[in-house]
């Protein structure tokens, strides 16, 4: 086992060979990264499905439910208000930092993230395409005004004095920023409206059942076609939103590499797959590239 392989959590000859194949692809440059929730798990933000591909939790909020029910919006904002501090406190991990370093070296020339946590940008990466939006922004569904989530947090605290202390009992906040609340706490929560027009506010993210803006999708397809390779990090590719870019890459002769915990929907299109921890794998990738000079 080489020195680089010994630092790779996957270890062993097969893992080392897969790592070297990954390094071959990345060293040629022009790499487009497509990242999913698995890249942020080491920052304390659980992914949706885990290694088995099965959803960990109950069905998330849908766009149709959110827009069609004031009660659903109150429940969403109460839980999200309590849990937002967890997302806001998360910090980039080794995987995020490795992607940013590959970009600084000019090997990664584009990043599409399915994540809404902003951690890849916090690690220093520029020009990240936020496929599903970002939790640190809020948008009005009537006038389209966008404001920082921190401003909404201030307004919700002012509208609900003492509510945080009453609701935030130990153990009520899940690691993903969602919060387990009693019905009475939800009923007591007051939602605020757009400061500009009084319209309904929504996090600036793509809910399940909501379409990604067509222009954003076109930009991602263009990035995929121009790439020398597509590197998928931490995504099971179960939903079409991300999988379509893998399929598009394969259809245009762009080589695909996938690093994820567990199998993915796109494995059949990949030149190489690694079922291994993201942080350790990407650290080992950097070490392999450094060893090559």
Functional labels for PLM-detected ranges:
Residues 1-293:
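Conserved catalytic core of sirtuin-type NAD+-dependent deacylases
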